[in-house]
């Protein structure tokens, strides 16, 4: 039996966290290639450390995209985050580009040829989740953890809070009663800051950001509000800790509330089902909930390399469904082509829309006019309802 009264915690990290710097650089490279060729192939991994950026991976795209353009793209991504520190500066960091051609063995399994449809770029399992806890149909703990850091970043970029530096983390513990979120029992925020800021002043600046995003009455007790528990946090970002692409997959998704298949998103073009099928799974789960068919929904898809159709479709409505799970499984298969090509075309993923996804979650975002966050639309809800009837 599912528990109804409990505490649950999720964390987020800011755009300036070392791993998120790498995610952003990798996704900026994906956008660089897709802007030049919507069918380019990209698998770009990034490492950052003190004044050093290394990009490695496999690509297939226009020859006009030179190492110099990739380097410029990496620097611009770091500049946009705001790193102009002695140990990590967008202008002075050494950038090494080690991208090379995609393996022909992999390409032959993915490419469409003759009457053979495009296959998945790899095997794997992908999960999507949605629930009615928030207006964007995301779990509350990760939703508020993201919003705290996003507000702090907005205040830093606008100049309202020049005391903040780019690197930060948050953690929110939510109290549930009868299965519903009713308040926050603790908040942890660790943020890099200017050297001349006292911890007392920093605490009040962070308090303002937290209060601005939590519902009235949800701010935790003072003794459960933690700001930089270890003290000063002046040295941060890649100068303080090395970063790698794909190290924050739980932050990127549901904050631990739902299963994860293990595949990271950033640095991958949409032929990679690690990314595209995870987006499709979220899209399907969100539309099931938006259709009023359930209060909670988990969708799993699985694939084999070189095979176009999913090997399995699984649905769990967590005891909140108005229909049976197998009805959902049959309906989603009829309402959406879940081949890699079908997903890309339905969600229009062959666009340069990925750099913006690299921080504050890939899910629970607002669909944008240029196709960004298309997997957050609820335009399949009516079709699903009609199919089940």
Swiss-Prot record:
Residue positions binding Mg(2+): 19
Listed pathway(s): Amino-acid biosynthesis; S-adenosyl-L-methionine biosynthesis; S-adenosyl-L-methionine from L-methionine: step 1/1
Main localization, broad class: cytoplasm
GO molecular function: ATP binding; magnesium ion binding; methionine adenosyltransferase activity
A GO CC annotation given for this chain: cytoplasm
Binding site for ATP: 17, 167-169, 241, 247-248, 264, 268
Cofactor(s) needed by this chain: Mg(2+); K(+)
Enzyme Commission number(s) of this protein: 2.5.1.6
SUPFAM superfamilies: S-adenosylmethionine synthetase (SSF55973)
Cofactor comment: Binds 2 divalent ions per subunit.
Gene Ontology terms describing biological process: one-carbon metabolic process; S-adenosylmethionine biosynthetic process
Binding site for K(+): 45
UniProt region (Flexible loop), positions on chain: 102-112
Compartments (UniProt record): Cytoplasm
InterPro entries named in the record: ADOMET_SYNTHASE_CS, S-AdoMet_synt_C, S-AdoMet_synt_central, S-AdoMet_synt_N, S-AdoMet_synthetase, S-AdoMet_synthetase_sfam
Residues bound to L-methionine: 58, 102, 241, 272
Keywords attached to this entry: ATP-binding, Cytoplasm, Magnesium, Metal-binding, Nucleotide-binding, One-carbon metabolism, Potassium, Transferase
Catalytic activity: L-methionine + ATP + H2O = S-adenosyl-L-methionine + phosphate + diphosphate
Sequence similarity: Belongs to the AdoMet synthase family.
Quaternary structure and interacting proteins, as annotated: Homotetramer; dimer of dimers.
PANTHER family according to UniProt: S-ADENOSYLMETHIONINE SYNTHETASE
HAMAP family given in the database record: S_AdoMet_synth1
Free-text function comment from the UniProt entry: Catalyzes the formation of S-adenosylmethionine (AdoMet) from methionine and ATP. The overall synthetic reaction is composed of two sequential steps, AdoMet formation and the subsequent tripolyphosphate hydrolysis which occurs prior to release of AdoMet from the enzyme.
Entry protein name: S-adenosylmethionine synthase
Annotated gene: metK
